Amino acid sequence: MSSKRPCSIVGSFWMLWIWTATSMVARAVILHPNETIFNDFCKKSTTCEVLKYNTCLGSPLPYTHTSLILAEDSETQEEAFEKLAMWSGLRNAPRCWAVIQPLLCAVYMPKCENGKVELPSQHLCQATRNPCSIVERERGWPNFLKCENKEQFPKGCQNEVQKLKFNTSGQCEAPLVKTDIQASWYKDVEGCGIQCDNPLFTEDEHSDMHSYIAVFGTITLLCTFFTLATFLADWKNSNRYPAVILFYVNACFFIGSIGWLAQFMDGARNEIVCKSDNTMRLGEPSSTETLSCVIIFVIVYYSLMSGVIWFVMLTYAWHTSFKALGTTHQPLSGKTSYFHLVTWSIPFILTVAILANSQVDADSVSGICFVGYRYYEYRAGFVLAPIGFVLVIGGYFLIRGVMTLFSIKSNHPGLLSEKAASKINETMLRLGIFGFLAFGFVLITFGCHFYDFFNQAEWERSFREYVLCEANVTIAHQTNKPIPECAIKNRPSLLVGKINLFSMFGTGIAMSTWVWTKATILIWKRTWFRIIGRSDDEPKRIKKSKMIAKAFSKRKELQKDPEKELSFSMHTVSHEGPVAGINFDLNEPSIEMSSAWAQHVTKMVARRGAILPQDISVTPTGTPIPPPEERNKLWMVEAEISPEMMKRKKKKKKRRKEVRPAGPAADEGNPAYHRREFGPSAVPRLPKLPGHRSLVANLWEQQRQQQEEQDMLPGAFPEFRPSCPLPYQDRYGGLGYLRNKPSSLPLANPLTLRDSMQGDLSHFQQSSWQPKGVFRHLGQEASMMDVGRTAVVPRADGRRGVQIHSRTNLMDAELLDADSDF
């Protein structure tokens, strides 16, 4: 028993020793498969030499010997020290400088003891790759500093240099500034961002551009404000399409000008274009900054896009309105709401898309935030593409509108009054000038942007070279070498930027010129008189149709007092809007209006029976009165004759005068032609009419009327009555008989009967009475006479046989008369 116990103890000891040795070997193999347990994989055998420099990049070294075996580009310590000074140019990249200092010292001045030098670890090498990407991009890493060399940079090794504390921190050389905001870092230079002031322009150029913007922005602001104020001062007459579209266009440019001029408020420019770390705002909106940049962008961009889309609506409205000249058709009726929907929604969608992609950038030269200062493809897609589309569509409608006006002026000269023709000429001239300016400004804008697009890459390359040159200045200071002169070789032209801004501000000024007319002066004159409570002496432009409508609306008052005068408010008076040449028709009222016409408008309306009460009939006694529902169907409400028809009527009338004999003798000798004589009107209290060749009978007719008055009035013969009551449709040919019988006679007053009823007169009692004088019907029995109505005499073909009190006759007479106000 005792002999077996020592043997078991010895066996256990040997098993423990074997297990420990196996674990150590396995650990060595796992950590470094290419090494053995007997080799130190974190060190490399070499010859050590005494350090000549006790510091590395400003930090003291805790050892006394080193080796140059790791720095393949240096054969002596002097060369190694010089190379370190050249690498010190990375001091201008703070985040790179913080991680590359230990690596450089571990390679150029490593610790060497007992013939072995310490190797830098793989982790120390990899830590420099991302922060120092500018080295890889500009010059590339040398072979002895590439992390792919596993023998040079083994894993898991501790280095004496890593324990050093470097007391020098990185800095950003102008035009870069130090920042911890990653979004502000300049490409490949982590820790530095571009300064707020654009480095491509000098301070003097900044001041020059700011003064330029202040001048033209103020001019645009004042011009557009004057236009808006002019529209608002006479809004009742100005709020008409298409002219009111210019109000919205000027409103857009007015708001945009406010966005441009906001930078001149105290401290506003730095708040708009600069971040809190004094770097330029790029890629807005961001969660760490204020919304001042975004607000200015929305004001400028949204108003600009809305203004150019309103321009398309303006040209379309011009085109459709010009096509409808001379007609009562309102082409824009019901479409204006769509104008607003399209014009305000499309810029909103574009604005939201830009903000969603964070493509709002600031520019210290212009002092605003806009899209595409950094990535020009966004400016091309969100600015140039919409403006180009607008240019094509708006130009098409503008050209068509001018062609329409030219066609009206050339093909229909007889339709135009002298004033309308003058306005068409003026409008075509102004449209031509406006179109030329609009196309010119847009083409200038395109040219300036193309200039930016084609030269952007060269400007960026020049700026990058300038940044590297500034880094070399730091190296020159460290190595006591000549300091290079750094300058940006290729810079954008300030003149091109001014031209681009002029095209934008010039467009706003051009839009405001539409109110630079004489009508605007009159508007402000009336406004001033209205403010001070004084009435102006300007002749009022009152449309005759409005005057007649006013008299008709006051018919009850005028019936009681026929001598009452009408008063017209400013709402009835039709002043010319501020946009002269846009809102006009071919028959608009003239300023020179006869005062006598205006004073007698009530009598003229009364003459047409407009103010007669409903229970008064103009039918003489013995004529059946039609029911009100039938009577209303036959009144002719309006009579509108085109200029061509008026010319044809005058020519036809002239030919009749040449063929038809004149004078009383000729009429008596020609039984086929008889003139109608005027009898006293049955309408009570109708005003007497002035002498008129088309309305009042001649003197010889008046004398004949006095002689035969008793014979001509059917009401004086009560024996002429129908023997049996007849239905109204059978008695009145205008409703029954004539409704189904075609007649060449025009519609007359429904309260009179027509000559065409003679076929149904067998229902009336016959009489042997015959009228005397020239109105005696030769060879006609009394039974064939139209009894119970005013005598109507057969006339020559083509002449109307209706009463003189007919609305149609009166209207035709005045429309066909050259001296008539109608």
Swiss-Prot record:
UniProt xrefs under SMART domains: FRI, Frizzled
Q: Does the keyword Disulfide bond apply?
A: yes
Pfam families, sorted: Frizzled, Fz
Listed GO CC annotations: cilium; dendrite; plasma membrane
Question: In what way does this protein cross or attach to the membrane?
Answer: Multi-pass membrane protein
Q: Residue ranges of the FZ domain? A: 43-160
The transmembrane residues are: 213-233, 242-262, 294-314, 336-356, 382-402, 431-451, 504-524
Q: Does the keyword Disulfide bond apply?
A: yes
Q: Which residues bind cholesterol?
A: 73, 373
Give the UniProt keywords, A-Z: Cell membrane, Cell projection, Developmental protein, Disulfide bond, G-protein coupled receptor, Glycoprotein, Membrane, Receptor, Signal, Transducer, Transmembrane, Transmembrane helix
Query: Which segment of the chain is annotated as a signal peptide?
Result: 1-28
Record's compositionally biased regions (Basic residues): 647-658
Q: Where is this region: Disordered?
A: 645-687
Report any one BP term from Gene Ontology. dorsal aorta morphogenesis
Q: What is known of its domains?
A: The N-terminal extracellular domain mediates sterol-binding which is required for maximal activation of signaling. Contains a second sterol-binding site within the seven-transmembrane pocket which is also required for activation. The activating sterol is likely to be cholesterol. The extracellular site is required for shh-induced activity while the site within the transmembrane pocket regulates basal signaling in the absence of shh.
- Family the entry assigns: Belongs to the G-protein coupled receptor Fz/Smo family.
Name of the protein described by the UniProt record? Protein smoothened
Organism of derivation: Danio rerio (Zebrafish)
